[in-house]
C-alpha cells in the first residue's frame, strides 16, 4: 500500500510555513509584516493600530509582540478571530457604517498611528474580475484609514499588480508624503501581490470624495483619436501602431474604389486609412475615370500603393480628384435667382408726416443731450482725479498756455461775466481737457461737494492702509516713516507777534469775505488752523494730549511776550535820542500801542537754558554727514556764518501743504541736499561702531555684576567679624591682627579650579564611551598618542624660541 503524500500547491509548505509553526504564528503572512517593519520601523512607536481583514490574526500577533505595552490594537474581519493577548477583535464588513461606529467605540477620541490591510477577495478563475475586486477593496480600506489616521500616520496595504495598480499609487501619493512599493522575501515569487507602505499622512481638512470612488479612480482614459491629416501631410512622422489590430478590424490592406474616392466628402480620411485606390474593369464609372486624360501613368502608379507616398504625391492625387470633379460637374451649387421683392410703402398724410418729423427731432435732441451730459460728467471725473493727484498745471508739456484761455480758472473776466454760481455748480472746468474722447459705458456724476469729499477721503484712506500694511511687514520702512514724521514740520519764519495793530485793522477793513471772493487759496482750504494734517490732528485729539496742548500754548505766549518787551524797550531808547518834534509824533503814534507788563523772566531764562543744555547733551552723531560737519566745526574749517549760509538753499522753504502723501514719500528719497563726507569721518564713525559692538553682552554684564555683589557681601561679612574680633578683650593685639589677616586672606583668596582627572584609555577603559568607573567630577580621556603629540609640541615650541 502506497504512502499518502500531502499536496503543496504553489509551494505553500515552504520554510516560512515551517517557521510560522515553530514560532507560534497563525499564518506565514506574519513574516511579511515582520520584514516590512524591519525595513521601515513603524510598529515600535505606534500606540494605536488598526488591522483590517485581520483573520486569522498573524499580523495581530506580530503587532502585539512588537508594540509598546499598553498599546491599543484592534482587528476586524468577516471571519471570526480567536482571542489574542492585548488585542480587540470583532466581526464586521469594513465597507459598512457599522464597522466605523464600532471602531469609534474602541478608539474613543484617539487616532490610529498605523492602519494595516492584508485582505483579498476570494480568487477564482476570472483573474481580471478578481484583480478589480481587490483594488476596490484596497480603496475602501484606504477610505477607512483616512478617517481614523492621525496626521503623519502610516498605512500598509497589499495590492495586486494589475491595470489599476498605477491608479491606486496616484491616489496614495495625493494623500501621503512618501509612498513606496516593496515585496518582502517571505512573499512567493509566483504571487502577484505587492505591498505599498504609505508614510506621512497629510490629514486634509476635507477629503475629496472622488479619491474614494472606484468609478472615478479606475476610469479608463480614452485614447486620442488618430490624426489622419498628419498621415497625409506629414507622412515622415507616421508612427506604427504597436498595440495590435483595431477593434473588429483584422485586415491591414484596405482598398477603395476610384469612384468612391472622387465623390467622397472627406478624401483625406480615405487617403490616411486606405492602402490602394483601384480601378476595377467591371465597374463602368471607374473605367471612365481611368480613360480620362488627367489620369496619367504617374497618378495610377501613386494610387497603387498609398502607404509609401510622400507629401508631394498626396497633393498630386488631390489635384487630380479636383480636376475630375470640375469636368464632371460634381459639387457645384445651383444658384437660384434672387427675386427682389418690392414693398410698397403707403403714402403718409400731412399730420402723420409732421408727427414723424417731430419724433425724429426729439430723438435727435435726446441723443445730443445725453452725449453732452456724458462728456460733462466724464470731464468732471477727470478734473477731480487731477485735483487729487496734484496735476492742476501740467508745466512739463505746455498745457498751462492752453489753460489760460477764456474758460480757465484764472480768467477773471469770464468768471465775472458768467457769475459765481457757474463756478459753484461746477460747470466751469478747472483746466481744459486734452482728450475729448469719452467712454460710452461709464457715466459717473459728482454733482455735490459731499461726493468729492467722500472720494478724497476714500483715496486718502486707501493710501494710509497701504502704508500701514507696508509698515507692518517691513521694519526698516516703519523706522524710516517714524523718523520722517519728526522732520515733516517746516519752518515758516520768525513770528514774534509785534505787527502793528493799525495794519491788522487796515487789513480787516479792506479784506473781503471768503464767500464774495473769486480767487481763493486751494492750499488753505485743505489745511487746519494749526497747520497739522488730518492724520496728525486725529492723533493729537486723544485725551492724553489735553494737558500738553495748554502747556505748549503757555510757552508760546511767554516767548511772544518776551520778544515784544525787548522790541518795545529798543523803540523807547531810540525815542529818547530824537528831537521834540519826533517825540510828539511818537507820542501820537504810541497812543494805540498796548503796553505789556514786564514779568520776571529770570526763571524762564533758566528753564530755557536748562532745556537747551539737555538738548545739546543728547545730540548723538550717527551719520557720516554729521561726523563730517562736527570735524569741520572742531577744526574751524567752517564757522557759524558758513553754516547759516549753507542753510539757505532750494530745500529750505519747501511747502508741503496740499501735496499728496504718495508724492512726498517719493520725493524724500531724491529731493534732498547731498552733503559731502570725508574719509576720516567714515573711519571715525566706523571705529565708534566697533567700540559699541565690542561691549560685552547683557548676560556677561549681569554675571559680572552678580560676582561683584557677592564679593562686596563677603567683604562686609569679613568686616563685621573683624569688628567683633577687635572689640573682644580675650585676645591680644597681635592675635587680633593675625586673626583679621587670616579672615581677609581667606575672603580674598580665589578657589583654584579643579583640574580634570586624567583617565588612560587602556585596559577596561579602552574604547569606553561612558564615564569610567570610580571617577567623579570632570575627567579627560588620554592615551599614548596624545602624550607623544604633547611632547612634540613642547619640543617644537622650544626649538622655535632658540
Curated annotation (Swiss-Prot):
GO terms for cellular component: nucleolus; nucleus; preribosome; preribosome, large subunit precursor. The keyword Transmembrane helix does not apply. GO terms for biological process: assembly of large subunit precursor of preribosome; maturation of 5.8S rRNA from tricistronic rRNA transcript (SSU-rRNA, 5.8S rRNA, LSU-rRNA); maturation of LSU-rRNA from tricistronic rRNA transcript (SSU-rRNA, 5.8S rRNA, LSU-rRNA); rRNA methylation. Residues 768-779, 793-802 have a biased composition (Basic residues). PANTHER family: PRE-RRNA 2'-O-RIBOSE RNA METHYLTRANSFERASE FTSJ3 (PTHR10920:SF13), RIBOSOMAL RNA METHYLTRANSFERASE (PTHR10920). The modification Phosphoserine is found at residue 362. InterPro entries: RNA_methyltr_RlmE (IPR050082), RNA_MeTrfase_FtsJ_dom (IPR002877), rRNA-MeTfrase_E (IPR015507), rRNA_MeTfrase_SPB1-like_C (IPR012920), rRNA_MeTfrase_Spb1_DUF3381 (IPR024576), SAM-dependent_MTases_sf (IPR029063), SPB1-like (IPR028589). It catalyses: a ribonucleotide in rRNA + S-adenosyl-L-methionine = a 2'-O-methylribonucleotide in rRNA + S-adenosyl-L-homocysteine + H(+). This is AdoMet-dependent rRNA methyltransferase spb1. Disulfide bonds: none annotated. Gene3D superfamilies: Vaccinia Virus protein VP39 (3.40.50.150). S-adenosyl-L-methionine binds at residues 57, 59, 77, 93, 118.
